[in-house]
Amino acid sequence: MMLRGNLKQVRIEKNPARLRALESAAGEGDPAALALALPGEPPVPAAPAGEDRPADEGGFTIDIKSFLKPGEKTYTQRCRLFVGNLPTDITEDDFKRLFERYGEPSEVFINRDRGFGFIRLESRTLAEIAKAELDGTILKSRPLRIRFATHGAALTVKNLSPVVSNELLEQAFSQFGPVEKAVVVVDDRGRATGKGFVEFAAKPPARKALERCGDGAFLLTTTPRPVIVEPMEQFDDEDGLPEKLMQKTQQYHKEREQPPRFAQPGTFEFEYASRWKALDEMEKQQREQVDRNIREAKEKLEAEMEAARHEHQLMLMRQDLMRRQEELRRLEELRNQELQKRKQIQLRHEEEHRRREEEMIRHREQEELRRQQEGFKPNYMENREQEMRMGDMGPRGAINMGDAFSPAPAGNQGPPAMMGMNMNNRGTIPGPPMGPGPAMGPEGAANMGTPMMPDNGAVHNDRFPQGPPSQMGSPMGSRTGSETPQAPMSGVGPVSGGPGGFGRGSQGANFEGPNKRRRY
């Protein structure tokens, strides 16, 4: 984030002569030199726009934006400075004015009792410049000691895979909190060493990552190779230990009695120096042996892990295959059940259709029967035709039809007595004579019985009445009373189509049969 300090033009003094004069005057207590370092001194006036300053002044104008590297984050823990040997009466405003030439600070902390403080600048470069210029500066008779503050939220990550990069490392540890920097350490050839470090913006995320990775197994890649997370060891490999910071103790003076030298062979110094070197060589060999054993164990573990992973993949494939087969079997069962259900539904529909058809047929028959019983009355011809069809079969297949009172004779036998009547419709009881019966057909033809209905109301007294012979449906005889004569029905006569050996008899022919009755 670029703040307004990035747009601020600052002037940094780079005059070595003035710095040397300042250092020499610090020991003599020169007021001018001390005033130069006081925070209350007036700022160095900047050159007006368009005006060139002389080159011998030793100052130059810089832009703070030029001190930010591409992609560098601002106000990180790496931009934090430790300022020691502060005066006990320094205020926070005086402390800020001391660093106001290096941009706008974001964190200011002062411990007046112990005489130290912390300040965080915008970029690492500006912090390095401030450290180089202000370290050793005299402030109220005290030389300032400025160092980069220890990064308390930095972690060391070991056992990294060769395919892990800076971006992957940062992405992996971002789940614990904001990460300021993540670096995978490489050798001089650019090959990964399996180590790296991660710097968080605050301590709580670092503690969380340390606890989570210590309790569980944090994997960064497909290979089940967990990372080892430890607190980062802080080393000052830039400033080191200067002579002015050495404590002049008795041990210090004793060790400094002789200058650096080479031990002469055969002397006491050379003997023990050789023993120290042998101890170091033994340590080196043991470390190499330990490293070799660890490397072999890692290779063996990787081989076993690869074989186990292959077997695990095969097991997963088998399980997946079994699961698919089970799913196919279940789908097949569902399909069979669906087909069975459809078949049952189809059979049920067919049964219902058949039952509906039977119900319709039964209903139609009942309706027909009801209609016959209620509204249908058969005529005489239909009754006679039914009687002819339901009659007994005579010789040679002739049908012998008769009425309920005079059944027809079979063959060449004479007509049977019909309720005491003879062939000439004469009864054995006294009374008026009946008219002649129907004419005899040929042999095998239907011999119809005497009709029961009278022809008219006239009473015939003669035995053989005049007029045409009576037809089927003609009156059986004369009755008392007058009745309206009925018209003869057409088409009624002897049944034709009988077998050909029977001739057609005449109406008035005498029947000579065994059952012939005597005439009186």
From Swiss-Prot:
Keyword Ion transport: no
Places the protein is found: Nucleus speckle; Nucleus, Nucleolus; Nucleus matrix; Cytoplasm
Ranges for domain RRM: 79-151, 153-234
KW Iron (keyword) present: no
Residues recorded with modification Omega-N-methylarginine: 504
Assembly mode: Forms heterodimers with NONO; this involves formation of a coiled coil domain by helices from both proteins. Found in a RNP complex with CAT2 transcribed nuclear RNA (CTN-RNA). Interaction with NONO is required for its targeting to paraspeckles and perinucleolar caps. Interacts with SFPQ. Part of the HDP-RNP complex composed of at least HEXIM1, PRKDC, XRCC5, XRCC6, paraspeckle proteins (SFPQ, NONO, PSPC1, RBM14, and MATR3) and NEAT1 RNA. Interacts with ALKBH5 (when acetylated); interaction with acetylated ALKBH5 facilitates recognition of N(6)-methyladenosine (m6A) RNAs.
The protein, known as: Paraspeckle component 1
Organism from which the protein derives: Bos taurus (Bovine)
